[in-house]
Amino acid sequence: MTNQQKESQNKQESYEVDRKVISGLIKKALNEVEGIYAVKRGLWGERIKIEYLQEGIGLSLQLIIKEGNAIPQLVEETQKKVKQEVQRVLDKPVAKINIKIKGIKHIS
């Protein structure tokens, strides 16, 4: 290893971001999407599944949406906003965002 590589390696900071922080970023982004009603709990109580993949962060969300929204457009907007927020704050790529619509809330 050259001196330059050692210096570069020593300058690299090591840190870890708690899953609750990432979940908070995702929830913040979801609040900006008009048609989202709630994040649904999964079988094991998880609202948001976070995976660390070789190519970046993988996310899985189970959502309840508000009645009257076009699902394809809503999913696309949700993925875009979540990806932007997570990448902006963490400076790490988001490799995938899986969204499962678990229900539609009828609001009178």
Predicted regions and their residues:
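N-terminal, Lys/Arg- and Ser/Thr-rich interaction peptides
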Residues: M1-Q9
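Intrinsic low-complexity, intrinsically disordered or marginally ordered coil/linker segments
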Residues: N3-Q4, K49-I50, K105-I107
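N-proximal, solvent-exposed amphipathic alpha-helical segments enriched in charged/polar residues
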Residues: N10-I48
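Short edge beta-strands and adjacent turn/loop segments
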Residues: V33-I64, I101-G103
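Amphipathic, heptad-repeat alpha-helical segments used for oligomerization and assembly
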Residues: L63, E67-I71
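Short, non-transmembrane amphipathic alpha-helical segments
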Residues: I71-L90, V94
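Short, highly charged C-terminal tails/helix-capping segments
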Residues: P93-S108
